[in-house]
Structures are given as C-alpha cells and as structure tokens.
C-alpha cells in the first residue's frame, strides 16, 4: 500500500512538472532510450505580479526565438539520423523530451525536475505495482542548456543524480569545476580561451583604453573577470566596468548609458547574451551614441536581437567571436520540411509557423493535428494562448512556403550552435554505442564489467562520456578533457551591412586557434574589416597618443598606467617600436642614434698614425731620431778633435744612443694600443731617460771632481776611468730596470676599452696596471735628474769646454719644467690625449737634452773650427786657473787688510775700485826708473800675437809721490807655441798676499805642428812676481814637461813649492789671457 501511494505521489509530481509546459511548449517522442533537451524557444517570460491571492500560474514565455527553434530542430534531426543509421545503436530507438527554457532559470528548472522525477519513478520499478498504463522511460542524458547561468542551475540539480548534461552553448569557466558540477560536459570551448582571445585582439590593434560590460550572471561575471586578468598582463586599462541584465530597471540602464557616453574609451568589451544586452542597445540607439567599437563574446556575436538593421549605425563594425562553423548534411532540407501538420511530435511547430508567417492557426481540419496523447496533460495548468497576440492575426492557410521568408531559422550558412547541438547528440549516441558494444571483461566498471544497454542508467552513460573518443562527420576527433570541455577554436566575425537586402551579415575576418603557440594563435585579415561608420581605418582607443619609436611611456601620477606621457629615451638607450614601455640599453660597443630608434657602433678613438696630431708627433719623433743620429755621426767623424775628446767621447756616444731610445720610445704611444705596446712603452721611456740622465750625471760629476781635486793622484786616474763610469751608468739604469720588472710581473699594463669617458666614443687606452709603479718610475727618473742638476749647477764655473754645466743646467731645467707641467696635464686629460701629453713630454725633454748638450758643440765643430783647437782648450783652462788664483788672492788681501785695520790701519792712498782692460801707458811708480821702458801688452792677447810682442812706447814720466810705491809685476805663461801675458798693478804699499795655485788636470791637449815638427806641450807655470820687465821662461821654472793625449799632469804639493802668485800691496789688477778677461767683480762673485 505504501509503495502504491508513493507511486501516485511521484507520478503526480511528474505530471505537474509536465503540465507546466503546455502541449505547444514541448517536443516529445517515444523511444527505447530517452534524451532530454533544453532550448530557449523564447527569449524571456512575461513579468506578472504574483500577489498570491489566487493559485500562482506558470509564467508565460514571450518573444519567439527562431534560432532556438533551429537548435531544437538540430537535436531532432540528429536523433532521427541516428535512428535511421544501422551503424549506431542498431535495433534501438532514441526518443526525446525537449522543453523550452524561455531563457530563464525557473523554466529550465521546471523541465529539469521533470527529468529527475521521471527518472526517480523509473528507478523504483513501480510499474508492476502501479499498473501505470503510460510508462515514461528515464532520461539518461540532457542536451542543454544555452546560457551559462541556466546551465549552472541545471547542472547543480542533475549532478545530484549523476545525469549527464551536455551543453552546446554554455561556456562559463565556472562550469569546468568538476567538484561542483560532476555531470556537466560541453561541446563549446571554455570562456577562459575567449577572454584571452579578446585581450589578444585588443593588443593586436594596439588599443589600451577600453570599457567592459557583462551580464550579471554566471556567464558574464567570470568571463569579464578573466578578461581583466588578461588585460592587466598586457597593460590594457579599463575605464569603466558595468553589469547588466535583461531585467535591469530603467534607472540602471540610463546610468550605464551615461557612463558609456562620457567615457573616452571607444572600445567596449561585452560578455553577455543577446537578451541581457538588448535593453542597453535600445537606449544607446535612442540616444544615437555612435563611434563605438563593440567586442562581442560568442553569446551575442550573432544574436538576432542585436544584429538588426535599425541598430547598425550603433553596432556596425562589431568584432565578435563565433564558434567554428560545422557542416550538417541534409539539415537544410529538414528545416524546410517543418510544418505544423507534419511535425506531430514537435509541439513548438505551431507557434513557429504563426511567428514566421504572422498568422493564426485554427484548431480543426485546417489546423494542426491533435497532439499525441503522450503529450496531453492538464490543459488548465498549461500556458494559455487565448491572450496571445496571435489571436488577432489573420488565419494561416497551411500552404505557406517556408523558403520564401527570410528568418534566422533558415540562416544555415554558418552553423555554429546548431552544429554543437548535433555534436552533443552524437556524443551521447557514441557513449551508448560503447555500452552496446562493450565486451565483458573490458568494460569500464568493476572487474571490467559492462552495462546492460536495455537497462542502462544515467551514471553509466556519464562514465562512458568521460572516456569518449570518436571522429565526427567533419573528420575531427571528439573527446572531453578532465574538465568535461571539448577542444575547439573561434572564428572572428565582423558585422557588415548587406548591400542586397540591408540586413546585417557576419563576415569571417580571422580565426583564433586555442591550442597554437602563444603569438601564433590569432590571425586577422585587416583588409576585410569594416569599422563603425563604414570606415576602413582602425579606430583609436587609447588614453594617450602612441609613443613613437625613440620614446617610451612615462607614467602620469594619479592616472592609470595606460594614461602616460611620451618620454624620449636617454642617451645610450633606444626603442624601435611604438608604445615601448621601456627603452632598451645599447650594447657596450654601441650608442643610440640621434632619434634613439636604434643603436650605432661607437666611434673608436686612439692616437692614430693617420690623424694630423699623430702625424705631427710622429714627424717630431722622427726628426729627433734624425738629429740625434746626425749628431752621433758628427761626433764619430770628429772624434779626435779637442771638443769631442774634452766631452768624454764614450759617454757622449752612450748619451746619444740613449737619446735615440728616448725619441724612439715615444712612437710606442702612437697607434692602437695593444697589450704588448702597453707593456713596452712605459719601461722603454723610463729606462731610456734614466740611461740618458745617468750618462750626464757621471760625466758632469767626473769633471767636477777632477777640477776640485787638490792633488790628482793615481786613485783618481784609476777610479774615474771609463770602466767605473760605465759601471755607475749601469747601476743607475739597473735600478730602473728592476722597477720595471717588478711592475710588469705584479701589475702589467694592458689595453683597455674605456666606455665611460664619452658616451659616443670608445677610447682604447693603456691601463697602467699600477699608478704607484708609474710613480716610482717617473720619481726615480726625476731623482737622478735632480742630482744631475745639483752637480751641473755646482760645476757651472768650470772651464767652458769641460763645463757643459751651463747647458746641462739649462737642459735639466727644461727637463723639470716639462715633467712638472706633465703631471697636471696628464691628470686633467683623458682618452688619446693622455698618450699625446706623454709623447709631447718625452719629445720636449729629449729635444731639450739634445739641444742644450750637443748643438753648441756641433755648431763649433761644423761652423767654428778655429775654436776646436788645443790652444783654445788650454786658454779656457788657463782663464779658469787665473780666475781661481786671483779670487784666492783677493780674498786673502781682504783678510789681511781687515787685520791691518784692526791694528791701526795705514796712511796709504785709497784703494782703487776700478778694473779695466786697458794698456798701462803711465808708469805708476815714477820713483823707480826702469832700465827699459816698455808698453804693456794688450789685455786680450791671443797665442798667435803673443809670439810677436808689440814694441812698447816710452812711458811719460810722472811725478813721484812722497811715499814709496810697490813695484809693478808682469808674468808670462807659455802654452806650447803660445804666450799669454797678464799684468798686475799694485797701489797699496806694505801689503803682501800669497796664493797657491790649485793643481790642474790638463787633458786632450794635442800637439801643434810647427814646420812639420811636433812642439812639446808644456803645463801651466806657477806665477811669480819679479821686476817689471823680467820675463820668465819655461826653462827657468823647471816645471815644464810634455803632456800627451789623455794623460794627466802630475803636480807637486803646493805647500812644498814656491808660491804660485805673490802679490804685494794688491788692490787693483787686471788679468787677461786666452780670450778671457777676469775682473775684480768676477772674483768677488
């Protein structure tokens, strides 16, 4: 009894659910296996005020949907095709139960409850107890629904009973969640790919400022949220984002329209269905808001509600996504066969006919056939059509031609959703076929068991659907992934206005391959696109104008990232594309061009051989080498002349060789620096200069020691010979070699490409490795130069031909000036000028040394040969000896006078302070009558005229002073064939000064030829005072002797010999000889 009651309860519930749909709102046919279907035959329902004062009535569906009816027809066509096919489910018949969802969740749930209730009744096996005459088989799978929001509600209910649901148009990514929607599958791609494709299109057209509108349901919200994520990754900014629905009130619609009208974004992304978007489009059309580009999701990209000719000035040029079109052979003919009298199992045919031909079908002979008893239910609970607008239409004849009317129903050129429906039915049929052909032991269930096709249950079909794999009629592989999604691609369509009938047509302008590599997924044929206003030019939808190549986008504070200012790339960076977000840095050896659009190779700069500056320095260096070689050649050719001998020939040769090295070392600083030139140039320069200065130092110090030595002994001759001189030069140079060796071993210099000095130039320079080592190298050179300068300055009063002191002093001054100036110049320059400064310093110092030390001698050798003689050298030496002796005499005379003054002084005459070079024509001592009166010799008497003394005119007698005057003294000195006479005059009585002549070292005295016979060379004689007219010969002195070449004169100890010069009462005197005149002022200096 309990089971019987339960049977009637469930049967009543099923009957109520079925009766909610009138006979004209169902399509149903018997079969061995029943498939359910949910299709939007209407776009919505009429809103009624449910005050609950009477029994609530089922809502009335309004606004017929021709596309929805075509989708329904696709399901029926697929079932009939399968039933007639011997390959699929032979000996079995598929039936169907199809309901109208009216594009609402409530109507969809009514139909779903009917499926669930009928399945529950069937699962109880109540037929034997209930004796039900009208048994309705279970619905083992449901095809539908359309909208994602509707499918979400249906899937939640069907999933409780594991009834498979295969949707043909619900693309929301939320439905991929298998934890929530266990039995949901679909033959349409996931919206996640569609959102990515939308972002790719916006990026393709270089838009970055868009608005978004989404349906306020499970389709629009997830879709637009995914789009925001993709847009953010591509730096696409969203100006506004609004939610709408077909039930939005007027105020909400007005507010959204105001936002669209005031926005500067011209591209609007819409994730919505046609019914949800329609109210908004109508208001935009009313306000005539044009110039917008609509980016349509698949749900409304081909919606007949929006694609209306009267809306084209607003929605024309829309870019939308369409599912890949499929081919259904025979479907066109099937659509044309629809007729209310022939389609006995399709309760929707009557309304379709009336809506197509705008007429009204009467019941009876002329009307449609009575519905099948299987569809008959409680009419009072069904939808009442008495209030339908069709009641006021003209009567239909039933002879109307469906092919003569243009409706979306007959638009089968691009079968997208219809093909998805077709594919969904075939998917279920192939799952049933797998069950039908299952071999025990290989099945999908426990122990490889198989389901019974005659008693198959919904959950068993779901299991086989998840493992489905078959080939469609188009040759494509059909299989569902773990999320129940079917792989698929999108076609990109563009809304055009047909020139033939003025309708909106959808032209395919590209495609989007979901599974291609990133960057290769999107293809668009720009030439086929027609934009809003029939324009072919891509619209501008950016917050800011494009930043051209050479600039980058700069963020404006407080504005979205898409609102930016164009900032020029800094030097050294470039951008070669429009709207670059950042400038790329040029490689190290490159620099940005003037427009910063690309990088060009940096200019390589170094002190080149071919540039004017390098050529000039090279010419000066070559000139220095040539001059040095010329001087060396002159010295070698005239090596036996007195001047060359007097300058120490061997050291001079070595000095000239070092100068050649100095000039040559400057060439290592010119040309592109290489590692080997960098390692060689500083040591070559340092060692060459140290060798040069060492030669000058040893040479100058040797002459100084010889002339200042009181007794030149064999010790001097031994230790100041050539061996010691070269040893000292080597030791001084060896120290520099050690410094260079340590430098090259610890931190060797190397070539270096300097990018930091100037942006557009690479300076190839030498990195010195260690500035400290360079400092030691130059410092040691300067130390030797300072010592050399000290000795040169100390020997500045030596005989002119030995002395090179004046010129050495000048050369050292030049050397110090050059290198002192070099330090700040070196520190303040960079690049190739560093090498140039050092080359200039090397050349200047080298030329200074060469000119000061050698040019004067070369000039005498070549142009003044008369001065390059033994006599000239000896006279110069004699002048130096006289000068030293006279200075000593004057100094001692002053000391004696100071002592006499301290004892009371004398009554002599005032000393004369004038010294002149004149002949003594008056005898200053009249009281003494000389035996012979002679005229004094001229003060500057050359060796030649010294042999032929001029006769002296008689002196004029002068009155004798009362006091006794000292005698006048005249001394003669013989040098070989020359005679030098000097005179001393005394005017201070009773004063005696004694001076000893310093020992001298006469070298390089050549024998003079006299009648082809060698004359003996005689040394300097000691000076003695005698009578006025006395003449001392060399024989009387006993000190004469030959002096050979490079032979040193041995002198007695001055303390044991007679005074060299005795001057009595000395105050005023003149010493002349050898072309020189020594005065009192000179002796006092």
Swiss-Prot record:
The modification Phosphoserine is found at residues 893, 900, 921, 1068. Residues 638-649, 700-723, 791-806, 856-1085 are cytoplasmic. It is a multi-pass membrane protein. Its main location: membrane. GO terms for molecular function: amino acid binding; calcium ion binding; G protein-coupled receptor activity; protein homodimerization activity. Residues 856-1085 are annotated as: C-terminus. Residues 190-325 are annotated as: Ligand-binding 2 (LB2). Residues 1-19 form the signal peptide. Residues 950-960 have a biased composition (Pro residues). Keywords: Calcium, Cell membrane, Disulfide bond, G-protein coupled receptor, Glycoprotein, Membrane, Metal-binding, Phosphoprotein, Receptor, Signal, Transducer, Transmembrane, Transmembrane helix, Ubl conjugation. Ca(2+) binds at residues 82, 85, 88-89, 101, 146, 171, 189, 191, 232, 235, 298, 490, 558. Disulfide bonds join 61-102, 237-562, 359-396, 438-450, 543-563, 547-566, 569-583, 586-599. Residues 638-649 are annotated as: Intracellular loop 1 (ICL1). Phosphorylation at Thr-889 by PKC impairs coupling with G(q)/G(11) G-proteins, while it does not affect G(i)/G(o)-coupling. Phosphorylation at Ser-893 by PKC and Ser-900 by PKA promote plasma membrane localization. Residues 891-899 are annotated as: Arginine-rich retention motif. Phosphate binds at residues 67-71, 416-418. Residues 700-723 are annotated as: Intracellular loop 2 (ICL2). L-tryptophan binds at residues 148, 169, 171, 298. The extracellular regions of the homodimer interact in a side-by-side fashion while facing opposite directions. Each extracellular region consists of three domains, LB1 (ligand-binding 1), LB2 and CR (cysteine-rich). The two lobe-shaped domains LB1 and LB2 form a venus flytrap module. In the inactive configuration, the venus flytrap modules of both protomers are in the open conformation associated with the resting state (open-open) and the interdomain cleft is empty. In addition, each protomer contains three anions, which reinforce the inactive conformation, and one calcium ion. PANTHER family: CALCIUM-SENSING RECEPTOR-RELATED, EXTRACELLULAR CALCIUM-SENSING RECEPTOR. G-protein-coupled receptor that senses changes in the extracellular concentration of calcium ions and plays a key role in maintaining calcium homeostasis. Senses fluctuations in the circulating calcium concentration: activated by elevated circulating calcium, leading to decreased parathyroid hormone (PTH) secretion in parathyroid glands. In kidneys, acts as a key regulator of renal tubular calcium resorption. Ligand binding causes a conformation change that triggers signaling via guanine nucleotide-binding proteins (G-proteins) and modulates the activity of downstream effectors. Belongs to the G-protein coupled receptor 3 family. This is Extracellular calcium-sensing receptor.
């Amino acid at each position: 009894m309990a089971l019987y009651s339960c049977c009637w309860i469930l049967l009543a519930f099923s009957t109520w659910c079925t009766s909610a749909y009138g006979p004209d709102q169902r399509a149903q046919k018997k079969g061995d296996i029943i498939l359910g279907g949910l299709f939007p035959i209407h776009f919505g329902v009429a809103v009624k005020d449910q005050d609950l004062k009477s029994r609530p009535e089922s809502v009335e569906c309004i606004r017929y949907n021709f596309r929805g009816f075509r989708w329904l027809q696709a399901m029926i066509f697929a079932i009939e095709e399968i039933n007639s096919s011997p390959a699929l489910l032979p000996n079995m018949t598929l039936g169907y139960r199809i309901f109208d969802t009216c594009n609402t969740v409530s109507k969809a749930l009514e139909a779903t409850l009917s499926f669930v209730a009928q399945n529950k009744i069937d699962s109880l096996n109540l037929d034997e107890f209930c004796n039900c005459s009208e048994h309705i088989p279970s619905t083992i799978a449901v095809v539908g629904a359309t909208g994602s929001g509707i499918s979400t509600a249906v899937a939640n209910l069907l999933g409780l009973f594991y009834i498979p649901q295969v949707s043909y148009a619900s693309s929301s990514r939320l439905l991929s969640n298998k934890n929530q929607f266990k039995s949901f599958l679909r033959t349409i791609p996931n919206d996640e790919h569609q959102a990515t494709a939308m972002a790719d299109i916006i990026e393709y057209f270089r838009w970055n400022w868009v608005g978004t509108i989404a349906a306020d349901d499970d389709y629009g919200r997830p879709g637009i949220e995914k789009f925001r994520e993709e847009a953010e990754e591509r730096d696409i900014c969203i100006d506004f984002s609004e939610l709408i629905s077909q039930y939005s009130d007027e105020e909400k619609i007005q507010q959204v329209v105001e936002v669209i009208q005031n926005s500067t974004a011209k591209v609007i992304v819409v994730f919505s269905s046609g019914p949800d978007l329609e109210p908004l489009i109508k208001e935009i059309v009313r306000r005539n808001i044009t110039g917008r580009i609509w980016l349509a999701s698949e749900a409304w990209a081909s919606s007949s509600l929006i694609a209306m000719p009267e809306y084209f000035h607003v929605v024309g040029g829309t870019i939308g996504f369409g599912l890949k079109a499929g081919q259904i052979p025979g479907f066109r003919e099937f659509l044309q066969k629809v007729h209310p009298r022939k389609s006995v199992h399709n309760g929707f045919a009557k309304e379709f006919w009336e809506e197509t031909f705008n007429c009204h079908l009467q019941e009876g002979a002329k009307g449609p056939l009575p519905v099948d008893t299987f569809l008959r239910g409680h009419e009072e609970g069904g939808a009442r059509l008495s209030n339908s607008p069709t009641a006021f239409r003209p009567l239909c004849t039933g002879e109307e031609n469906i092919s003569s009317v243009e409706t979306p129903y007959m638009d089968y050129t691009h079968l997208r959703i219809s093909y998805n429906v077709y594919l969904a039915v075939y998917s279920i049929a192939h799952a049933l076929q797998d069950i039908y052909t299952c071999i025990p032991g290989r099945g999908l269930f426990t122990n490889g068991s198989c389901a019974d096709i005659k008693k198959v249950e919904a959950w068993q079909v779901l299991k086989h659907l998840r493992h489905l794999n078959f080939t469609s009629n188009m040759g494509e592989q059909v299989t569902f992934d773990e999320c129940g999604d079917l792989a698929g691609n999108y076609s990109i369509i563009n809304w055009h206005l047909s020139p033939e009938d003025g309708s909106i047509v959808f032209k395919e302008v590209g495609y989007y391959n979901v599974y291609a590599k990133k960057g290769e997924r999107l293809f668009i044929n720009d030439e086929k696109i027609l934009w809003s206003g029939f324009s072919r030019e891509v619209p501008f939808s950016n917050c800011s104008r494009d930043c051209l190549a050479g600039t980058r986008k700069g963020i404006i504070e407080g504005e979205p990232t898409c609102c930016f200012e164009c900032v020029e790339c800094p030097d050294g960076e470039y951008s070669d594309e429009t709207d670059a977000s950042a400038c790329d840095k040029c490689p190290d050896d490159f620099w940005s061009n003037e427009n910063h659009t690309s990088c060009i190779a940096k200019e390589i700069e170094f002190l080149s051989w071919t540039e004017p500056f390098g050529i000039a320095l090279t010419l000066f260096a070559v000139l220095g080498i040539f001059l040095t070689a010329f001087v060396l050649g002159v010295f070698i050719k005239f090596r036996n002349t007195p001047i060359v001998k007097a300058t120490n020939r061997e050291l001079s040769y070595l000095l000239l060789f070092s100068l050649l090295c100095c000039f040559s070392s400057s060439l290592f600083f010119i040309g592109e620096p290489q590692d080997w030139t960098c390692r060689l140039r500083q040591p070559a320069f340092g060692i060459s200069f140290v060798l040069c200065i060492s030669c000058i130092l040893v040479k100058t110090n040797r002459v100084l020691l010889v002339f200042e030595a009181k007794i030149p002994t064999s010790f001097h001759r031994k230790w100041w010979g050539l061996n010691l001189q070269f040893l000292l030069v080597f030791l001084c140079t060896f120290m520099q070699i050690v410094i260079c060796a340590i430098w090259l071993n610890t931190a060797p210099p190397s070539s270096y490409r300097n990018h930091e000095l100037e942006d557009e130039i690479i300076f190839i320079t030498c990195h010195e490795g260690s500035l400290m080592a360079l400092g030691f190298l130059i410092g040691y050179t300067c130390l030797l130069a300072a010592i050399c300068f000290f000795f040169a300055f100390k020997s500045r009063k030596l005989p002119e031909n030995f002395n090179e002191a004046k010129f050495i002093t000048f050369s050292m001054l030049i050397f110090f000036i050059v290198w002192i100036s070099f330090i700040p110049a070196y520190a303040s320059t960079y690049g190739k000028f560093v090498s140039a400064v050092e080359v200039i310093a090397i050349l200047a110092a080298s030329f200074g040394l060469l000119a000061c030390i050698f040019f004067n001698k070369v000039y005498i050798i070549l142009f003044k040969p008369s001065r390059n003689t033994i006599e000239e050298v000896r006279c110069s030496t004699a002048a130096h000896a006289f000068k030293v002796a006279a200075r000593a005499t004057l100094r001692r005379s002053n000391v004696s006078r100071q002592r006499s003054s301290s004892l009371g002084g004398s009554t002599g005459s005032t000393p004369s302070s004038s010294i002149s070079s004149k002949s003594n024509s008056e005898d200053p001592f009249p009281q003494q009558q000389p035996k012979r009166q002679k005229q004094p010799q001229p003060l500057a008497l050359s060796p030649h005229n010294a042999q032929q003394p001029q006769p002296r005119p008689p002196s004029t007698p002068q009155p004798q002073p009362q006091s006794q005057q000292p005698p006048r003294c005249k001394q003669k000195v013989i040098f070989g064939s020359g005679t030098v006479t000097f005179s001393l005059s005394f005017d201070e009585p009773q004063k005696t000064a004694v001076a000893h002549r310093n020992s001298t070292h006469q070298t390089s005295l050549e024998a003079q030829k006299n009648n082809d016979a060698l004359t003996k060379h005689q040394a300097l004689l000691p000076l003695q005072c005698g009578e006025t007219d006395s003449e001392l010969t060399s024989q009387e002195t006993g000190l004469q002797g030959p002096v050979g070449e490079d032979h040193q004169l041995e002198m007695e100890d001055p303390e044991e010999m007679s005074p060299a010069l005795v001057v009595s009462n000395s105050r005023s005197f003149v010493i002349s000889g050898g072309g020189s005149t020594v005065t009192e002022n000179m002796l006092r200096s």
